[in-house]
């Protein structure tokens, strides 16, 4: 064994002092512990799981989902809640907008009987509740809907015409400073839903911005933009929207990946439509003209008919889904794989 240099001895002494003062594990060499795969919660969309690069929403991170009104922000978040619950996780929904549709959430697969819901009166109250849930170490995913509805107490108690410049931005900045370290220890996925506003006087460039200041942009490990693309029609009836999702920021994989899926009214993300598109892209499902085929057998003429075939034949749907997941390197998540150690974070 090589003799330690003065520099090595000095760093070992410093590390020893740090561990005695702040606890074991407060500092270590990165190579001293095995690098583990990032634990995730599926987004509910195979295409988005692939675009995120790690197989879903990472645990122990802050995530922002933003976009125009009625673009599918809450729907995407509720799909993630349903996936977390399927893995045996506990989910919480901070309904700052007081607009959670329980019947719709159930249709998306959310177990509403087990969902923790809070409808806070002020932004401070909402973020304190989030902090307490995170520190419990028992909650797997928390949705805050939305940042724009986190109104500071001073604004609620003040008069209608009063100016409250920067109050919400300061509130978000302070909360995120507290929350970021804690969620890393408890492996809680914290998703903020945000709205879009327009900057005044912008001539060049994009005038759009999100509410709540810049803190969330910095602290978020993943930022997702969601927008309507085109309407999905059956004759004159609009059944849903083709929706475009872009990963604007990603600290865990290359960003700027874009995907599209069908967002159907009353149903959420169309699993059949998404699987059909991915199956064709991967060569698992054959497309010739308007006809779709699988294993040499025709499954439908036109996209809508092929989607209906998948709905009527779940065994074929499951076969194709298994092949797509295998091709993507995505295993079916289980509580054991993605489970986290339950324990209280240090106050």
UniProtKB/Swiss-Prot annotation:
UniProt record, GO biological process: DNA recombination; DNA repair; SOS response
Cellular component GO terms held in the UniProt record: cytosol
Compartments where located: Cytoplasm
Keywords, comma-separated and alphabetical: ATP-binding, Cytoplasm, DNA damage, DNA recombination, DNA repair, DNA-binding, Nucleotide-binding, SOS response
Basic and acidic residues: compositionally biased ranges: 337-347
Gene Ontology terms for molecular function: ATP binding; ATP hydrolysis activity; ATP-dependent DNA damage sensor activity; damaged DNA binding; single-stranded DNA binding
UniProt entry tagged with the keyword Iron: no
Pfam families cross-referenced by the UniProt entry: RecA (PF00154), RecA_C (PF21096)
Region feature Disordered, mapped onto this chain: 327-347
Binding-site list for ATP: 67-74
Family stated for the protein in its record: Belongs to the RecA family.
Protein name per Swiss-Prot or TrEMBL: Protein RecA
Organism: Desulforapulum autotrophicum (strain ATCC 43914 / DSM 3382 / VKM B-1955 / HRM2) (Desulfobacterium autotrophicum)
Species classification: Bacteria, Pseudomonadati, Thermodesulfobacteriota, Desulfobacteria, Desulfobacterales
């Amino acid at each position: 064994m090589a003799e330690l240099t003065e520099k090595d001895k000095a760093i070992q002494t410093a590390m020893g002092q740090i561990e005695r003062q702040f606890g074991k594990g407060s500092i270590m060499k990165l190579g001293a512990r095995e690098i583990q795969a990032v634990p995730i919660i599926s987004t509910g969309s195979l295409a988005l799981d692939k675009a995120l690069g790690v197989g879903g929403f990472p645990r122990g991170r802050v995530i922002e989902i933003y976009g125009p009104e009625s673009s599918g922000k809450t729907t995407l978040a509720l799909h993630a809640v349903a996936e977390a619950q399927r893995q045996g996780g506990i989910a919480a929904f901070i309904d700052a907008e007081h607009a959670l549709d329980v019947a719709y959430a159930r249709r998306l697969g959310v177990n509403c009987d087990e969902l923790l819901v809070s409808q806070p009166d002020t932004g401070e109250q909402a973020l304190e509740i989030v902090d307490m849930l995170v520190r419990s170490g028992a909650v797997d995913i928390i949705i805050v809907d939305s940042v724009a509805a986190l109104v500071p107490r001073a604004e609620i108690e003040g008069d209608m015409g009063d100016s409250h410049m920067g109050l919400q931005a300061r509130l978000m900045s302070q909360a995120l400073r507290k929350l970021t370290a804690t969620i890393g220890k408890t492996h809680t996925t914290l998703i903020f839903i945000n709205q879009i506003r327009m900057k005044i006087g912008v001539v060049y460039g994009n005038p759009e911005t999100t509410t709540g200041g810049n803190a969330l942009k910095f602290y978020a490990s993943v930022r997702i933009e969601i927008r309507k693309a085109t309407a999905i029609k059956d004759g004159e009836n609009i059944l849903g929207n083709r929706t475009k999702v872009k990963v604007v920021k990603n600290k865990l994989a290359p960003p700027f990946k874009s995907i599209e899926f069908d967002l159907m009214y009353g149903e959420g993300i169309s699993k059949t439509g998404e699987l059909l598109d991915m199956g064709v892209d991967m060569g698992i499902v054959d497309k010739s003209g308007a006809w779709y085929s699988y294993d040499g057998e025709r499954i439908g003429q036109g996209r809508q008919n092929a989607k209906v075939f998948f709905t009527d034949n779940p065994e074929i749907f499951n076969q194709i889904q298994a092949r797509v997941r295998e091709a993507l390197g995505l295993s079916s998540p289980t509580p054991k794989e993605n489970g986290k150690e339950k324990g209280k974070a240090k106050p």
